[in-house]
Amino acid sequence: MAYPTISGPYGLVPVNLIGGRAFVGSTRMVPIRSGYSEHISLGDVVQIDTATGTLVRSAVGTPGATQAVVNGTLGVFLGCEYSSSTGPIYGKNRYQNWAANTVAADAIAYVADDPQQVFKAVALTNTGSASNKVQAAFGQIFLGSNLELVTNYTSNTLAAPTSGNSSGGLCAGSSNAKVTAAAPFRVVGFVNETALSVTTSIPSTVTNATQTPASMTGIYPGMQVSGSGITTPVYVQTVTSSTFTVNSSFTSAAGTNYTFTGAQEVLVAWNFGHHSYANGTGV
Protein backbone atom coordinates (compact mmCIF):
# COMPACT_ATOMS: atom_id res chain seq x y z
CA MET A 1 0.00 0.00 0.00
CA ALA A 2 1.22 3.48 -0.83
CA TYR A 3 2.19 5.56 2.16
CA PRO A 4 0.45 7.56 3.28
CA THR A 5 -2.98 7.12 1.73
CA ILE A 6 -5.45 10.01 1.56
CA SER A 7 -8.86 8.37 1.77
CA GLY A 8 -10.86 11.60 1.80
CA PRO A 9 -11.08 15.14 3.18
CA TYR A 10 -10.75 15.55 6.95
CA GLY A 11 -11.29 19.27 7.56
CA LEU A 12 -8.60 21.73 8.57
CA VAL A 13 -5.79 20.53 10.84
CA PRO A 14 -3.54 23.06 12.64
CA VAL A 15 0.12 22.59 11.72
CA ASN A 16 2.04 25.68 12.81
CA LEU A 17 1.91 29.47 12.49
CA ILE A 18 3.05 31.82 9.75
CA GLY A 19 6.82 32.20 9.86
CA GLY A 20 7.31 28.60 10.98
CA ARG A 21 6.42 29.34 14.59
CA ALA A 22 5.16 26.38 16.60
CA PHE A 23 1.51 25.66 17.28
CA VAL A 24 1.47 24.48 20.88
CA GLY A 25 -2.21 23.61 21.09
CA SER A 26 -3.49 26.95 22.36
CA THR A 27 -7.22 27.41 21.79
CA ARG A 28 -9.98 29.81 22.75
CA MET A 29 -12.98 28.48 24.68
CA VAL A 30 -16.29 29.71 23.27
CA PRO A 31 -19.79 28.74 24.49
CA ILE A 32 -22.12 26.62 22.35
CA ARG A 33 -25.82 27.27 22.87
CA SER A 34 -27.68 24.38 24.50
CA GLY A 35 -29.73 22.59 21.87
CA TYR A 36 -27.77 24.08 18.95
CA SER A 37 -29.27 22.21 16.02
CA GLU A 38 -26.33 21.57 13.65
CA HIS A 39 -23.47 19.07 13.81
CA ILE A 40 -19.99 20.54 14.30
CA SER A 41 -17.09 18.19 13.59
CA LEU A 42 -13.38 18.30 14.38
CA GLY A 43 -11.79 20.48 11.69
CA ASP A 44 -14.91 22.46 10.72
CA VAL A 45 -14.63 26.24 10.29
CA VAL A 46 -16.76 28.02 12.89
CA GLN A 47 -18.04 31.52 13.56
CA ILE A 48 -19.78 33.63 16.18
CA ASP A 49 -23.57 33.71 15.89
CA THR A 50 -24.67 37.33 15.54
CA ALA A 51 -27.91 36.73 17.44
CA THR A 52 -26.54 34.92 20.50
CA GLY A 53 -22.77 35.46 20.68
CA THR A 54 -22.30 31.70 20.81
CA LEU A 55 -20.43 29.37 18.47
CA VAL A 56 -21.98 27.99 15.27
CA ARG A 57 -20.53 26.32 12.20
CA SER A 58 -19.54 28.60 9.33
CA ALA A 59 -22.19 29.98 6.97
CA VAL A 60 -19.62 30.31 4.16
CA GLY A 61 -21.15 30.19 0.70
CA THR A 62 -21.00 27.54 -2.00
CA PRO A 63 -17.67 27.47 -3.89
CA GLY A 64 -17.69 29.49 -7.10
CA ALA A 65 -15.44 31.96 -8.86
CA THR A 66 -14.88 33.57 -5.44
CA GLN A 67 -16.06 33.02 -1.87
CA ALA A 68 -17.15 36.02 0.19
CA VAL A 69 -16.12 37.06 3.69
CA VAL A 70 -18.34 35.75 6.50
CA ASN A 71 -18.39 38.24 9.37
CA GLY A 72 -17.68 36.61 12.71
CA THR A 73 -15.46 33.83 11.35
CA LEU A 74 -13.46 32.71 14.36
CA GLY A 75 -11.33 29.72 13.38
CA VAL A 76 -11.46 25.93 13.38
CA PHE A 77 -13.33 23.67 15.80
CA LEU A 78 -11.08 21.34 17.82
CA GLY A 79 -13.62 19.70 20.12
CA CYS A 80 -15.84 20.63 23.03
CA GLU A 81 -16.77 19.85 26.61
CA TYR A 82 -20.03 19.74 28.54
CA SER A 83 -21.57 18.01 31.53
CA SER A 84 -23.53 14.80 31.12
CA SER A 85 -26.45 14.06 33.41
CA THR A 86 -26.76 10.48 32.20
CA GLY A 87 -23.18 9.22 32.48
CA PRO A 88 -21.25 7.06 32.05
CA ILE A 89 -18.91 9.76 33.37
CA TYR A 90 -20.60 12.54 35.32
CA GLY A 91 -19.45 16.13 35.29
CA LYS A 92 -17.59 17.67 32.36
CA ASN A 93 -16.88 15.30 29.48
CA ARG A 94 -14.75 16.11 26.43
CA TYR A 95 -15.86 15.31 22.90
CA GLN A 96 -14.33 15.43 19.46
CA ASN A 97 -17.51 16.79 17.90
CA TRP A 98 -20.82 18.45 18.75
CA ALA A 99 -23.90 16.36 17.89
CA ALA A 100 -26.88 18.40 16.71
CA ASN A 101 -29.53 19.20 19.35
CA THR A 102 -27.36 18.23 22.31
CA VAL A 103 -28.79 19.73 25.49
CA ALA A 104 -26.03 21.05 27.74
CA ALA A 105 -26.16 24.39 29.51
CA ASP A 106 -22.40 24.48 30.10
CA ALA A 107 -21.16 23.49 26.61
CA ILE A 108 -17.84 25.04 25.60
CA ALA A 109 -15.99 24.66 22.28
CA TYR A 110 -12.23 24.68 21.75
CA VAL A 111 -11.36 26.86 18.76
CA ALA A 112 -8.02 27.37 16.97
CA ASP A 113 -8.63 31.10 16.63
CA ASP A 114 -5.18 32.49 15.77
CA PRO A 115 -5.53 34.45 12.50
CA GLN A 116 -1.91 33.49 11.68
CA GLN A 117 -2.60 29.77 12.02
CA VAL A 118 -1.41 27.49 9.20
CA PHE A 119 -3.63 24.50 8.43
CA LYS A 120 -3.29 21.28 6.46
CA ALA A 121 -6.24 20.24 4.28
CA VAL A 122 -7.12 17.96 1.36
CA ALA A 123 -7.32 19.34 -2.19
CA LEU A 124 -10.73 18.96 -3.84
CA THR A 125 -12.19 19.86 -7.21
CA ASN A 126 -14.67 22.72 -7.53
CA THR A 127 -17.98 21.23 -8.64
CA GLY A 128 -20.00 24.29 -7.66
CA SER A 129 -21.37 22.37 -4.68
CA ALA A 130 -20.71 22.53 -0.95
CA SER A 131 -21.09 18.73 -0.86
CA ASN A 132 -18.21 17.33 -2.88
CA LYS A 133 -15.33 14.99 -2.09
CA VAL A 134 -13.84 14.65 -5.60
CA GLN A 135 -10.05 14.61 -5.44
CA ALA A 136 -7.70 17.24 -6.83
CA ALA A 137 -3.93 17.66 -6.56
CA PHE A 138 -2.45 21.15 -6.70
CA GLY A 139 0.82 21.78 -8.53
CA GLN A 140 3.55 24.25 -7.57
CA ILE A 141 1.85 26.88 -9.75
CA PHE A 142 -0.86 27.19 -7.05
CA LEU A 143 1.56 28.53 -4.43
CA GLY A 144 0.35 31.99 -3.39
CA SER A 145 -3.10 31.57 -4.93
CA ASN A 146 -6.37 31.46 -2.99
CA LEU A 147 -8.57 28.48 -2.16
CA GLU A 148 -12.22 28.14 -1.23
CA LEU A 149 -13.84 26.04 1.48
CA VAL A 150 -15.90 22.96 0.61
CA THR A 151 -17.79 22.32 3.84
CA ASN A 152 -19.33 18.87 3.22
CA TYR A 153 -21.50 19.35 6.30
CA THR A 154 -23.52 16.44 7.67
CA SER A 155 -27.24 17.25 7.72
CA ASN A 156 -28.80 17.51 11.16
CA THR A 157 -31.42 15.01 9.96
CA LEU A 158 -28.64 12.40 9.92
CA ALA A 159 -26.57 11.00 12.76
CA ALA A 160 -23.33 12.78 13.56
CA PRO A 161 -20.27 11.30 11.79
CA THR A 162 -19.06 8.30 13.78
CA SER A 163 -15.45 9.43 13.39
CA GLY A 164 -16.24 12.87 14.77
CA ASN A 165 -14.11 14.31 11.98
CA SER A 166 -14.98 16.98 9.44
CA SER A 167 -15.26 16.12 5.75
CA GLY A 168 -14.32 19.63 4.64
CA GLY A 169 -11.63 20.37 2.08
CA LEU A 170 -10.33 23.16 -0.15
CA CYS A 171 -10.82 23.84 -3.84
CA ALA A 172 -9.75 26.28 -6.53
CA GLY A 173 -12.21 28.54 -8.36
CA SER A 174 -14.87 27.77 -10.95
CA SER A 175 -13.67 25.17 -13.49
CA ASN A 176 -10.77 24.57 -11.08
CA ALA A 177 -9.06 27.80 -12.13
CA LYS A 178 -6.52 29.53 -9.91
CA VAL A 179 -8.13 32.17 -7.70
CA THR A 180 -6.54 35.57 -7.17
CA ALA A 181 -9.78 37.26 -6.03
CA ALA A 182 -11.62 36.92 -2.72
CA ALA A 183 -11.41 33.52 -1.03
CA PRO A 184 -10.80 32.51 2.60
CA PHE A 185 -7.42 30.76 2.34
CA ARG A 186 -3.98 31.39 0.81
CA VAL A 187 -1.73 28.51 -0.27
CA VAL A 188 1.55 28.80 1.65
CA GLY A 189 2.94 25.31 1.03
CA PHE A 190 2.35 21.68 0.10
CA VAL A 191 2.61 18.32 1.87
CA ASN A 192 5.31 16.53 -0.11
CA GLU A 193 4.84 13.18 1.64
CA THR A 194 1.48 12.65 -0.08
CA ALA A 195 2.22 14.42 -3.38
CA LEU A 196 1.48 12.58 -6.62
CA SER A 197 3.48 12.24 -9.82
CA VAL A 198 2.44 10.32 -12.93
CA THR A 199 3.97 10.07 -16.40
CA THR A 200 2.14 9.17 -19.59
CA SER A 201 2.55 9.79 -23.30
CA ILE A 202 0.37 11.70 -25.74
CA PRO A 203 0.09 9.58 -28.92
CA SER A 204 -0.74 12.37 -31.40
CA THR A 205 0.57 15.87 -32.09
CA VAL A 206 -2.22 18.30 -31.21
CA THR A 207 -2.26 22.05 -30.61
CA ASN A 208 -5.02 22.51 -28.09
CA ALA A 209 -5.77 22.96 -24.40
CA THR A 210 -7.55 19.60 -24.48
CA GLN A 211 -5.29 16.59 -24.99
CA THR A 212 -5.84 12.83 -25.15
CA PRO A 213 -3.06 10.91 -23.36
CA ALA A 214 -2.34 7.21 -23.51
CA SER A 215 -3.73 6.87 -19.98
CA MET A 216 -5.73 9.09 -17.63
CA THR A 217 -4.88 7.05 -14.55
CA GLY A 218 -3.71 9.28 -11.71
CA ILE A 219 -4.38 12.60 -13.46
CA TYR A 220 -6.40 15.09 -11.38
CA PRO A 221 -7.49 18.73 -11.66
CA GLY A 222 -4.81 21.09 -10.36
CA MET A 223 -1.84 18.99 -11.48
CA GLN A 224 1.00 20.84 -13.16
CA VAL A 225 2.07 19.44 -16.54
CA SER A 226 5.62 19.40 -17.91
CA GLY A 227 7.04 18.08 -21.17
CA SER A 228 7.77 18.91 -24.80
CA GLY A 229 6.01 22.00 -26.14
CA ILE A 230 5.21 23.43 -22.71
CA THR A 231 7.24 26.61 -22.27
CA THR A 232 4.98 28.33 -19.73
CA PRO A 233 3.71 26.30 -16.74
CA VAL A 234 0.24 24.88 -17.29
CA TYR A 235 -2.11 23.00 -15.00
CA VAL A 236 -5.05 20.66 -15.45
CA GLN A 237 -8.48 22.23 -15.03
CA THR A 238 -10.85 19.46 -16.07
CA VAL A 239 -10.62 15.74 -16.73
CA THR A 240 -12.77 13.11 -18.43
CA SER A 241 -12.24 9.39 -18.77
CA SER A 242 -10.04 9.97 -21.83
CA THR A 243 -8.94 13.64 -21.92
CA PHE A 244 -7.58 16.45 -19.81
CA THR A 245 -7.89 20.19 -20.38
CA VAL A 246 -5.26 22.65 -19.18
CA ASN A 247 -5.48 26.40 -18.64
CA SER A 248 -3.47 27.25 -21.77
CA SER A 249 -3.09 25.58 -25.17
CA PHE A 250 0.16 23.80 -26.08
CA THR A 251 1.43 21.65 -28.94
CA SER A 252 2.03 18.09 -27.83
CA ALA A 253 4.73 15.93 -29.39
CA ALA A 254 3.48 12.55 -30.58
CA GLY A 255 4.73 9.65 -28.48
CA THR A 256 6.47 11.92 -25.98
CA ASN A 257 6.06 11.48 -22.23
CA TYR A 258 4.45 14.18 -20.08
CA THR A 259 4.66 14.38 -16.31
CA PHE A 260 1.80 15.46 -14.04
CA THR A 261 2.59 16.51 -10.46
CA GLY A 262 0.42 17.79 -7.64
CA ALA A 263 -0.13 17.74 -3.88
CA GLN A 264 -3.13 15.96 -2.42
CA GLU A 265 -2.70 18.03 0.75
CA VAL A 266 -1.94 21.73 0.97
CA LEU A 267 -0.86 24.14 3.69
CA VAL A 268 -2.95 27.29 3.92
CA ALA A 269 -3.30 30.43 6.03
CA TRP A 270 -6.21 32.82 6.50
CA ASN A 271 -6.51 35.57 3.93
CA PHE A 272 -6.63 39.08 5.35
CA GLY A 273 -10.19 40.13 6.13
CA HIS A 274 -11.66 36.61 6.12
CA HIS A 275 -10.84 36.00 9.79
CA SER A 276 -12.88 38.24 12.09
CA TYR A 277 -9.80 39.36 14.06
CA ALA A 278 -8.45 40.90 10.85
CA ASN A 279 -11.77 42.42 9.78
CA GLY A 280 -13.06 45.77 10.99
CA THR A 281 -16.71 44.67 10.73
CA GLY A 282 -18.06 43.24 13.97
CA VAL A 283 -21.00 40.95 14.62
For the regions a language model picked out, list residue spans one by one.
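Small/polar beta-strand repeat architecture
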Residues: 82-115, 196-283
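Ser/Thr/Gly-rich low-complexity blocks that favor extended beta-strand/coil architectures
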Residues: 44-70, 149-177, 214-243, 251
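A sequence-level detector for low-complexity, Ser/Thr- and acidic-rich stretches
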Residues: 2-6, 19, 23-140, 145-156
